[in-house]
From Swiss-Prot:
GO MF entry, a single one: beta-N-acetylhexosaminidase activity
Primary gene name: nagZ
Residues that bind substrate: 62, 70, 133, 163-164
Organism of derivation: Idiomarina loihiensis (strain ATCC BAA-735 / DSM 15497 / L2-TR)
InterPro entries: Beta_hexosaminidase_bac, Glyco_hydro_3_AS, Glyco_hydro_3_N, Glyco_hydro_3_N_sf, Glycoside_hydrolase_SF, NagZ_Beta-hexosaminidase
Family to which the UniProt record says this protein belongs: Belongs to the glycosyl hydrolase 3 family. NagZ subfamily.
Name of this chain's protein: Beta-hexosaminidase
Gene Ontology annotations for the cellular component aspect, listed alphabetically: cytoplasm
Main location as per UniProt: cytoplasm
Record EC number: 3.2.1.52
Active site per the UniProt annotation: 176, 246
Sites marked Important for catalytic activity: 174
Enzyme class: hydrolase
Amino acid sequence: MAQLMIDIAGTELTAEDKKLLAAPAVNGLILFTRNFASLEQLQELIREARAAAAKPLLIAVDHEGGRVQRFREGFSAIPSMGSLQKIENEDERQRAARDLGWLMAAEVQAVGIDISFAPVLDVDDCSDVIGDRAFSAVPSEISKLASSFIEGMHEAGMACTGKHFPGHGSVQADSHIAIPEDDRTLEQIRAHDLKPFLSLIQKLDGIMPAHVIYPQIDPQPAGFSEFWLQQILRSELQFNGTIFSDDLSMQGATVAGDMEQRAVAALKAGCDMILVCNDRAGAVQVLDADLPATEPESAQRVNRMLMSSNAVSLEELKRTQRWEQAQRWL
């Protein structure tokens, strides 16, 4: 059975939300700023969503830090990963990356959310939509800092997701509103953008491919490409973690057809879980479609992204020495 991650419009579940969450193919929910009014409300929403779901629900958020942090009030203001470059001492930079990875993950899990889609492994090249979301413009520096950040996430008990494979940072167009194309050869991408993914592949629990077309390599965006997902990611890199599609409602995904065609293409290419956000009609269309079944291993991979144990409350977390230690980097 296909695995689908959906979104909801408000701070409470509607009857339609509950019906969709109960659909057998839905086992993921992504939350946005619009779903947050207070810590208490957010935790109640999460409890209700889990109760409504037909099977274990993977709840996710984009909580990278900087300009991409969906929840603010009650949460630490995580700085952008690019701002770590302001720390001149390398050991201190690595310590900051690890502490911030832990802090982000621990706070997000404390309210009942399984994962934040992080870290960004893109190179800070010419993309405004990436920019300071990236650790650096230098692949080797990204690899070092992201490795420490992931260690912090894992210390907190959160699975990590590297994005946007094989690299979104070297195209100017924003795949939310355009269809970016990167005209470089495979050799050029291997020598630059792909390096952080190559070096961190053993640490990554999940990967999210880019809605970017690399026409010298494949006419399909990476998230719909068997070459990128099967030949490179699964076969060559031996990646055995979860592959999440990026949001299928983004403009960069429209080349694959209507929402049903996008879902089919992403699943056939090798995505374990597909995301349909900000398009309720599209989500319903996907649920009503005859989608290709995913292999049993695919469900196991998604289930490995769930929290392994109950996290402490946010209030308890803020009383720990580890939390105090991480605050120095804010």
